[in-house]
């Protein structure tokens, strides 16, 4: 039975030095051809994960899914790794990451809710064969920012095998077209070489237009040895400071001061500056 299988897994985990649990979705619960009615992991996977976590303090939970799923035990897991849907070498790649031969340096391209009920756009549903995007510009992480709520994991989130300190940032000046460069100095404060994805977001709280609370303007990946500092150079293009004018049917720029923020995700920003565009 399922209960017996879960109990056997817990016993095996307790007898081991460490445990790895792989959970996720399948083609029966997740597909490109249809929407999901739930974000919960299928079957008794949550019970399995909790049983192993309770039996073995050194447990890594690997989530094999193509999109956000609910992880109600995430606060209990010492390590959580999102593996997505890998190809034929996914097993070898996962082994490299688990053994430390490779660093898990990816970043989330979506925001993960703590629960389906907590998603800001949960009530957006098609009616009469037509889906109206009433949220407008506030899609994805922008919806959470507008609602002022905290997801389980923000867009852009991701950890590796080292730690990073954000030390300084220089933004601008902006050119005639509005584009500018952001230079962010980060330091590897851990004990292993690592890769960091420095993300730059813009804000315009005094705008006369409807805008997201903040939006991604650019990013750059850098690598550094333990103790070393490195500069990430992020090119912010013209389009990042422009807005679409429905009346004029084209991209336009609102002159003024933009707030520039740099950090590790849409919800973890370490440095702040400003740049003025004309």
Where are these regions (language model features)?
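C-terminal non-catalytic regions of proteins with extracellular/luminal or membrane-system context
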Residues: 1-278
């Amino acid at each position: 039975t399922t209960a017996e299988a879960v109990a056997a897994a817990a016993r095996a985990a307790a007898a081991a030095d460490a445990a790895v649990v792989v959970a996720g979705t399948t083609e029966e619960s997740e597909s490109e051809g249809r929407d999901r009615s739930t974000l919960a992991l299928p079957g008794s996977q949550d019970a399995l994960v909790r049983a192993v976590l309770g039996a073995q303090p050194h447990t890594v939970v690997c989530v094999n899914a193509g999109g956000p799923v609910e992880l109600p035990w995430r606060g209990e897991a010492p390590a959580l790794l999102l593996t997505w849907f890998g190809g034929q070498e996914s097993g070898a790649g996962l082994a490299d990451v688990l053994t430390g031969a490779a660093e898990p340096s990816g970043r989330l391209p979506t925001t993960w809710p703590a629960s389906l009920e907590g998603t800001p756009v949960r009530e957006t549903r098609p009616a009469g064969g037509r889906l109206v995007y009433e949220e407008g510009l506030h899609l994805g992480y922008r919806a959470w920012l507008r609602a002022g709520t905290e997801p389980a994991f923000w867009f852009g989130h991701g950890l590796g095998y080292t730690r990073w300190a954000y030390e300084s940032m220089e933004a601008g000046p902006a050119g005639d077209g509005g584009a500018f460069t952001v230079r962010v100095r980060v330091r590897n404060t851990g004990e292993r070489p690592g890769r960091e994805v420095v993300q730059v977001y813009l804000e315009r709280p005094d705008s006369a237009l409807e805008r997201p609370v903040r939006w991604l303007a650019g990013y750059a990946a850098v690598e550094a040895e333990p103790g070393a500092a490195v500069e990430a150079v992020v090119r912010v293009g013209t389009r990042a400071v422009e807005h679409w004018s429905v009346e004029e049917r084209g991209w336009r720029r609102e002159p003024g001061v933009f707030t520039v923020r740099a950090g590790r995700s849409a919800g973890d920003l370490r440095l702040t500056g400003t740049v003025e565009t004309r």
